[in-house]
Design a protein with these regions (language model features):
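Conserved active-site tyrosine of GNAT-family acetyltransferases
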Residues: 33-38, 109, 136
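Short glycine-/small-residue motifs
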Residues: 140-141
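Short phosphate-engaging motifs
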Residues: 32-33, 101, 105
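Vicinal oxygen chelate
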Residues: 2-22, 44-97, 104-132, 144-151
Length: 151
């Protein structure tokens, strides 16, 4: 496996109709994090952001990741300050990537520099493992057992 394939639909940003879900991460270094997600997950960088506050926009498979340095408060978030996780072992949320072949993704992404906390482990009807990114965020990678249905 040399690439993770996704259907041929487009996921536009900004969307021309309806909406698109994106995930925002506060990072210490936008360039470093952008290159990490580009290299490990074959992300397509649309914009590298700037020092005026514009975030990095990266398309990863069928979703968008926005990266920006911390700060605040701002007029639209008057009581909120954004920062990277102070303790990478105490997090309140994480990204979850569902894959068709976890072993292939594990080998490919590890060869591209992903730091896995463990190898894939079978648990609750799926195999899963976690990656830690350069800012300490974790990313779950999971493959459901055959026959598992959602909904």
């Amino acid at each position: 496996m040399t690439n993770v394939e996704v259907d041929k639909k487009t996921y536009e940003m900004p969307p021309k109709e309806g909406f698109t879900v994106a995930h925002f991460l506060t990072v210490a270094d936008m360039e470093r994090s952008a290159r990490y997600y580009e290299k490990v997950f074959d992300g397509r960088i649309l914009s590298m952001g700037d020092t005026e506050g514009a975030p990095v926009y990266i398309q990863i498979a069928n979703t968008w990741l926005l990266l920006n340095v911390g700060g605040g408060p701002t007029p639209d978030k008057p009581t909120v300050i954004l920062s990277v996780p102070p303790d990478p072992n105490r997090l309140s949320s994480f990204m979850n990537i569902r894959v068709a072949d976890i072993q292939a993704c594990y080998k490919l992404w590890k060869s591209r520099g992903a730091e896995f906390i463990t190898e894939p482990i079978d648990k609750y009807g799926e195999a899963r493992c976690y990656i830690r990114d350069p800012d300490g965020y974790i990313i779950e990678v999971g493959q459901s057992d055959p026959g598992v249905k959602y909904g």
